[in-house]
Amino acid sequence: MYQKLQAPTLSSKEAAIQLLSRRDHGQYELYQKLALKGYEEADIEAAINFCLDHNYLDDLRYAKSQVRQHVYKGHGERRIRQELKQKRVAESIIDMAMAEEPQDWFELARMAAEKKFKGIKAKDQKEYAKQVRFLQYRGYSFDQISYALSFEDED
C-alpha cells in the first residue's frame, strides 16, 4: 500500500534547478518539494543556498508573481497575503511585493462582483449577504465590498 521512497537519481541541486526551471518557487515551497523527493536535509539546505547564491531562487520575485497571478484571478489583498503567509513568505517580502505591484483594490472588487453577479443588485438581505460572503472569501475588505456592491444595474 505504501511505497518506500527510492533514492533520488538527480542531485539535490539538479532537482532544485529542474523545479525552478518550470516556475518560480518560494524558499519553503522548494524545501518541501525536495524533502518529498527524499533528499537529506543537509543536501536540501545546500541546494537552496546554491540557488539563492546564483539568483535562481528569489522570494520577492516569487511573491510578485503570486500577486499578479491572484489579481488576475480576482482575489483581494487579504486573500493574497494569507496565501503567501501559508507558503511562509516573510511579511516584509509580502509588503514589498504588494507595493511593487500596485492595484486599485476597490475597482478589482467591483469587477469581481460584476463578473460573478452580472451587475445585478441584490433584491433582498439574503442575496446581499451571499454577495458579501463571496467577496469576503475572495479577500476584499468591508469598505471594498461596500464600494463594489453599491453600483446599480446600469441596463
Curated annotation (Swiss-Prot):
InterPro entries: RecX_HTH_1st (IPR053926), RecX_HTH_2nd (IPR053924), RecX_HTH_3rd (IPR053925), Regulatory_RecX (IPR003783), WH-like_DNA-bd_sf (IPR036388). Its main location: cytoplasm. One of its GO terms (biological process) is regulation of DNA repair. The keyword Cytoplasm applies. It is found in: Cytoplasm. Pfam families: RecX_HTH1 (PF21982), RecX_HTH2 (PF02631), RecX_HTH3 (PF21981). GO terms for cellular component: cytoplasm. Keywords: Cytoplasm. PANTHER family: REGULATORY PROTEIN RECX FAMILY PROTEIN. Belongs to the RecX family. Modulates RecA activity. This is Regulatory protein RecX. It comes from Vibrio campbellii (strain ATCC BAA-1116).
